[in-house]
Regions:
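Short coil/turn motifs at secondary-structure junctions
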Residues: 65-67, 87, 120
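Conserved active-site alpha-helix within GNAT-family acetyltransferase domains
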Residues: 106-111, 116-137, 263-280
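Short amphipathic alpha-helix that is part of the acyltransferase structural core
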Residues: 1-64, 69-78, 144-191, 225-230
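Intrinsically disordered, low-complexity, positively biased terminal segments
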Residues: 2, 8, 151-396
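Conserved acetyl-CoA-binding loop-helix of GNAT-fold acetyltransferases
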Residues: 81-84, 89-106, 237-248
Length: 396
């Protein structure tokens, strides 16, 4: 028998051990991990009445977050630390955990949930869709790195790590207001996830370095002749050019690696010699789930005035199923209707297009969205349009 219940504080170490078993990692800083897990809402699936009585068989962590969406922010359940012991697989534990998360999110008034997927096909079945992607670059700086964009010439300065939350916080908030997909960062997140003394994923890199400009910042580390860019926010292309110029000119280094950049990053277009910039990867980033479809659709701004009838399928949340009249524009609305649909789609595909990063027209071509009214996909794309591609750089 499996019983779901909240995981008490004295079981946090059991959650850490379960995660290490499932994700095959070595625990190098238990105290910091314990601090992180202690901050979450924790759901545990306990085996009751068998030979492993009171086993922690599966788990899920949820952080109460704010997600930047076009025109504002929405309360969001940030799902993490999900796992089921190999001895308890195929017993419906993950389904039970996700259903519980959906119910908790609805009760807390969070219309969306989000996660990073270690195995993407799993979460599509639960209504999650890829809402944004990341791309990676390598820049050859063994020779001068010229730019077509004139860099902003105001001075840059290095910032002490302890001042990062106060100085970078407002800059990041402005960046998130411009670009959907950002998650709120508190002081703990800045110091422990953005600029920890040691990068647990790449321990060969040195201490974090933070360079700031009145209108932006860049966080990087170095190792040998390599500069690794972790995060950058720039309010104008000229400020962005100033950071690339700075990173390319660091003495004794020959390359910049930037594995986690937005898909519309300007560096490939800024470079005077495009051959100095190599695209090294493209990967799914944030998976989004619309827990409350009408609240989510009313909760973002829209780029065009229009009206659509959407026929939404949802295998997990009955309240989302059916036909919705979506009115876009200055006063968005979403109400139930019996009218014929313009578009029919699964809630996972609605999540994929929600932040403006995936064209509806593309999903029509893929075959996962049905266009019943000719031109409806293009019209919805026009309403969903955002000036900057959605981007999430906080892997939780």
């Amino acid at each position: 028998v499996i019983e779901l219940r909240n995981v008490p504080a004295d079981d946090v170490d059991r959650m850490i051990d379960l995660a290490a078993t499932v994700f095959h990692f070595r625990i190098t800083d238990r105290d910091r991990m314990r601090d992180w897990v202690s901050r979450m809402e924790r759901i545990g699936a306990y085996g009751i009445g068998g030979p492993g009585e009171d086993d922690l068989a599966g788990q899920m962590g949820v952080a109460a977050q704010r997600l930047s969406v076009p025109g504002g922010e929405l309360d969001c359940s940030a799902v993490t630390f999900v796992g089921v012991l190999p001895t308890y697989r195929r017993r419906g534990i993950l389904s039970s955990l996700i259903d519980r998360m959906h119910a908790d999110a609805a009760a807390a008034g969070r219309p969306v949930a989000a996660l990073w997927a270690s195995e993407g096909p799993i979460y599509g079945r639960y209504g999650f869709g890829v809402a944004d992607r990341r791309t990676g670059f390598k820049v050859d700086t063994s020779r001068p790195f010229g730019l077509r964009t004139v860099p902003d010439d105001r001075p840059l300065r290095l910032l002490d790590r302890e001042r990062v939350p106060d100085v970078l916080g407002p800059m990041y908030a402005r960046e998130s207001a411009r670009r959907p997909g950002g998650l709120a960062r508190d002081e703990w997140w800045w110091l422990n996830r953005l600029v920890p003394h040691r990068d647990e994923r790449s321990p060969e890199y040195g201490e974090p370095r933070v360079v700031v400009h009145p209108e932006g910042y860049a966080i990087y580390r170095t190792q040998g002749r390599t500069v690794r860019l972790y995060d950058m926010a720039a309010e104008t292309p000229r400020v962005e050019a100033a950071f690339w110029t700075y990173l390319a000119s660091i003495d004794l280094t020959h390359e910049i690696v930037a594995p986690e950049r937005p898909v519309d990053d300007l560096v490939t277009r800024m470079a005077a010699d495009p051959d100095q910039v190599t695209v090294t990867g493209d990967s799914a980033a944030l998976w989004l789930r619309l827990v409350d479809v009408p609240a989510a659709l009313r909760g973002r701004s829209w780029a065009a005035d229009d009206t659509f009838v959407l026929d939404v399928a949802d295998a997990r949340i009955p309240g989302n199923r059916g036909r919705w009249r979506l009115t876009t524009g200055a006063a968005p609305g979403c109400e139930r209707t019996g009218d014929a649909p313009d578009l029919a789609l699964d809630v996972a595909d609605l999540a994929a297009v929600y932040l403006g990063g995936t064209p509806v027209r593309t999903l029509v071509r893929v075959g996962t969205v049905d266009e019943h009214t000719p031109g409806a996909a293009d019209r919805l794309d026009a309403a969903l349009a955002v000036p900057l591609a959605p981007y999430t750089n906080d892997n939780f």
